[in-house]
Amino acid sequence: MHKKNLKKSLIDKAKSLGFDAIGFCEACEVDEETQKFFLSWLDEKCPDYMDYLKKNLDKRFNPTLLLENAKSIIVLSANFFRKSSENRIALYAQSKDYHIVLKEKLKEISTLLEQHGGIQKLCVDTVPIMEKYFAKKAGIGFIGKNTLLISPSAGAFNFLSLIVTTLELEPDSELLDSCENCNRCIQHCPTQALSEYSLNPNLCISALTIEKQTPLNDSEKNLIGEKIFGCDMCLKVCPKSKYFSLPKIPEFQNSFEYDKSKSSLQDFADIAKNTPLERRLKNSTPKI
């Protein structure tokens, strides 16, 4: 099959699986400026409980070290926006664990690549690779001041997944868009964790309630307030995050519901099963 025909088949397959966008870029080394910015952030702001980000930096910056003879990266985006009455839990965590859902879909796309002799590495948020950097290069969206990937299809409400492949596929152009003079995410962050294009995890509700596994100190407890798991403020206030249609992937279309006045910890555990919240319950007991 001609490379252009293969690319079209991949696009059609991705759309049939419910992805909102798919883009292609070269499996190249991350540019020097981005590497320096990330290393500086690690030195100045990365807390001990996120030290995993300091590991495998060579692979994180160079996908050819993740997969020998890697030529291309396929980036896929899935919208997870939907209305929910539960504001104490990040929206992405109110449905089936995206790691499980997206990995199965990537396997289907990988099968198509294998038929053309490709060898692949599937990446769903657990592999050391600069997802947002390559999503930008593949034309999926741009990186906003809230440090998130912002796309035309879902604003900041994106699940990103990547396929690194040994097949050479025609790259797409980067999307020409930006935050311009907008600072809504910075202005509305409840803990002032954001500055332009940089996040301080030591102040971020999401980092404190998701990444930190040890008990919170009094100052951190004051920061998170009534939040249980994550925070969506910088996603919600972004003008690019308009009210889109429901996600095309069925597992992301509905949020779980529970009666706060009657719920017990066991009720909460039952509801959280197979969601990103399940990991939180294994490590500590949230206040519900």
Language-model region placement:
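Auxiliary alpha/beta "docking" domains used to position bulky ligands
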Residues: 1-178
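Generic recognition of stable, solvent-exposed alpha-helical segments in well-folded globular domains
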Residues: 5, 9, 104, 177, ...
